[in-house]
UniProtKB/Swiss-Prot annotation:
Residue ranges, compositional bias (Low complexity): 387-406
Higher taxonomy: Eukaryota, Viridiplantae, Streptophyta, Embryophyta, Tracheophyta
Residue stretches making up the F-box domain: 57-112
Family according to the record: Belongs to the TUB family.
Protein name, UniProt field: Tubby-like F-box protein 12
Transmembrane segments: none
InterPro entries listed in its UniProt record: F-box-like_dom_sf (IPR036047), F-box_dom (IPR001810), Tubby-like_C (IPR025659), Tubby_C (IPR000007), Tubby_C_CS (IPR018066)
Pfam families for this protein: F-box-like, Tub
Amino acid sequence: MSFRSIVRDVRDSFGSLSRRSFEVRISGLPGLSGHHRGKSLGSLSELRDRPVVVDQSRWVGLPPELLRDVMKRLEEGESNWPSRKDVVACAAVCRTWREICKDIVQSPEICGKLTFPVSLKQPGPRDGLIQCFIKRDKSKLTYYLYLCLSPAVLSENGKFLLAAKRNRRATSTEYIISVDSKNISRSSNGYVGKMRSNFLGTKFVVYDTQPPYNAGSLMSCQHGSRRISSRRVSPKLPTGSYPIAHVKYELNVLGTRGPRRMQCTMHSIPASAVDPEGVVPGQPEQLLPGPFEESFRSTNTSSRFSFMDRSLDFSSSRFSEISGSANQQGEDDIPEAKERPLVLRNKVPRWHEQLQCWCLNFRGRVTVASVKNFQLIAAASSESSQLEQQQQQQQQNHASSSSSASDHGKVILQFGKVGKDMFTMDYRYPLSAFQAFAICLTSFDTKLACE
């Protein structure tokens, strides 16, 4: 049997296995099987105690040494979508296969690939950009983020990643972000965060359902926030709403004729993350929180989630435990909580005399002039400048100082128009796809005070 035949057989058998598992679980629920006989629903303890007999795939008992070799070949061979779905299918066969995939499939920061759902909230690659594009639907006030599969952005469908829906309110505008393209709402199981603006459209706050490394300090600084115990909230709904970023647009005296000036304060990313040896702490292990993931997890590969199944988030810890431990530790107990957040600013464009417009070098990724186009780089702080002066005075290694300066000058996020309701979005470390998408959504909002 060929290698690809093995992969197809594993994927097909896994799909039929998950369907049988789902039918067994549904038939065991009183009131849903049609034989409740007037009785009320049983307790969750009774439901968990009931054994579920499911047929196992014949590939579950594959020797670990052979399985690891198969996974390595699959990881190297199926490096791009849509063929990369075979890696996702193999990771969902059983716990043994999943653990091996966790060891072989690296994070986007290292490999530069988006494989599992949790990759959407992990930092991008340090070397190079992950190229994406955004489709806007003005009639439905929705925005869809896709992963570029080829250089032809206008003619490809891409790999769906995230969706956002704009909700207008009396004093603000809210963008709901979800991994479910068909049900974009806070009540959806695919809800991963939101972005809210003020009335003038000059200030924005990005909220995440996942707790960052400094969740305790963020929630304590949030004005009027109320902490709700995760045990008192429905476990199927996300309980966290952490303000991880603030985006501010400054007044533009030239109006629509001049470039926008924006500043992004990333509270979930320390300023030291852009240093050569810097890291982004507190990276999530799962995309969607779910305390009942072991009892109600559906392993169907044809899930209604448009990106990938939530059962492949690779986490054994519950969201309530993570958030609880973050809230129990005070700001004094966490040294990282006092570290300065990363600040991003837009790269200043230059005026082109012949074209009579402001220009930025997007390296062919942006083709239509628009006030929405921007490039973000790390802002130079006073402390980092003093540190560089001290390094020069002490005559330290010139290579390390030049490397640090180059890292601060790299474009971390760029966004621009390429056609009608079509925009490109390219991001890199230390931003994640979710953070980059939320920042780009601020450019779509109407800015009464800036234009």
